[in-house]
C-alpha cells in the first residue's frame, strides 16, 4: 500500500489533507513463547504485514477515527475529555488507551486528531494487530505534537494500554517487536532487564512461512491469564528455597533440582516450559549467529513440543500445522507463534519447496480441520515509522 493511496483515502473520509503518513508492523516470534511475562528471553521480529495510518491535528479537542477494516463502524468520534474504555468504541479503545497514557505521563497532547487506519494483518491471527495499532497511535501523537519520548518508553505505554486499559495481562514482547523492529533483524530481548540486541536473520536458501490456522484467537477470553497465574504461583512455591522473582532467572539444572517444591503437576509443567524455553531461545540465537540453521530448526521444533505438552496452549489446529510441516521435504523447523489457542504458526522452508509445502500442508489441514489455512511469506521489516 503506498503513501498516496493512504492519503487519498484520508482526504475522502475527512475532507482535509493528512499531515503525515505512517506504517506500523505486525510481528512474529521466532522462538521464546510465553517467556515474556516470566522474565525470560524472546526472539521476535517485525514483519511487513501491518497497519498503515494517516493523521492530522485538529484545532479543537475532538478525536475522530476511521478504519477501512471496519467500514461499517464509520467515523468513531470521542474527545480528549473522554478517554475512558467503552466497549461500543471497538478498536478505538486501543487508540484511546495510548493517548490516555501519553497524557498521564505528562506528554502534551493538547489538541484533537483525525486518524485514518488500514491494516493487512489478518484479524485474530495472533500477529499482534493490537500492538501494531498501539504503536501506530503512539508514533502518530509523537510526530504531530513533537513529543520528546524515547521509543522504549512508548513501547512501555503500549503494554500499559494492553494491561490496564484493555485488560489483557500480556508481557512486553509484542509492543517491543513492533516498535523496535529492524529490517532483516530479530531482537533478542531479556524481558527481565529490557536489555536487547539485534541479530541478523540469514536463513540462507530458506524463507519463513507464516501458517494461519484461520481460527481466531480471543486473547482476553483465552486461558492466557490462567497460564500466567499458574507460573506466578509456581514462582511463589520455588521462593521457599530460591531467591528469585521470575522463572527467567533460573537455568534448567537449577530448576530441575528445585522442581520438587512445586506441588501441582500442571504448575510444574507450566514452569518447566518457561525455564526450558528461555534456555532454548538463547541457544537458538547463538545457532543462528553461527549459521547452524539445522540446530536452529530443531530448537524451533522443541519449542512447539513444549508448548503442546507442557504449556498446553496449542490445540488441534496449530498441532496439525506443525506436525504436518515437520514431515515435509525442505522444512528445517516449525512451531506455533504468539499466544496460541489458534492464530499462526511459522515454518522455515527451503525456497524451492514452498509451493509443494503449501499444497501438502494445506491439504492435510483442510481434510482434518474442515477449512483451509492461509500462508504468507514473512519479510522482516522496520518498526513503526513515518513514511
Curated annotation (Swiss-Prot):
Gene3D superfamilies tied to this protein: 3.30.230.10, GHMP kinase, C-terminal domain
Site (Transition state stabilizer): 27
Record: residues binding ATP: 67, 124-130
UniProt GO cellular component terms: cytosol
Highest taxon of the lineage: Bacteria
Catalytic residues identified in the record: 174 (proton acceptor)
Binding locations of substrate: 33-36, 224
Pfam families cross-referenced by the UniProt entry: GalKase_gal_bdg (PF10509), GHMP_kinases_C (PF08544), GHMP_kinases_N (PF00288)
Primary localization: cytoplasm
Family matches, as InterPro entries: Galactokinase (IPR000705), Galactokinase_bac (IPR022963), Galactokinase_CS (IPR019741), GalKase_N (IPR019539), GHMP_kinase_C_dom (IPR013750), GHMP_kinase_C_sf (IPR036554), GHMP_kinase_N_dom (IPR006204), GHMP_knse_ATP-bd_CS (IPR006203)
GO biological processes: galactose metabolic process
Tagged with keyword Metal-binding: yes
This enzyme's EC code(s): 2.7.1.6
Catalytic reactions on record: alpha-D-galactose + ATP = alpha-D-galactose 1-phosphate + ADP + H(+)
Subcellular location: Cytoplasm
UniProtKB keywords: ATP-binding, Carbohydrate metabolism, Cytoplasm, Galactose metabolism, Kinase, Magnesium, Metal-binding, Nucleotide-binding, Transferase
Pathway the protein takes part in: Carbohydrate metabolism; galactose metabolism
Residues binding Mg(2+): 130, 162
Top-tier EC class: transferase
UniProt GO MF annotations: ATP binding; galactokinase activity; magnesium ion binding
Function recorded in the entry: Catalyzes the transfer of the gamma-phosphate of ATP to D-galactose to form alpha-D-galactose-1-phosphate (Gal-1-P).
PANTHER family: GALACTOKINASE-RELATED, MEVALONATE KINASE/GALACTOKINASE
Family membership noted in the UniProt record: Belongs to the GHMP kinase family. GalK subfamily.
Matching NCBIfam families: gal_kin, PRK05322.1
Protein's UniProt name: Galactokinase
Species annotation: Ligilactobacillus salivarius (strain UCC118) (Lactobacillus salivarius)
Top-level taxonomy: Bacteria, Bacillati, Bacillota, Bacilli, Lactobacillales
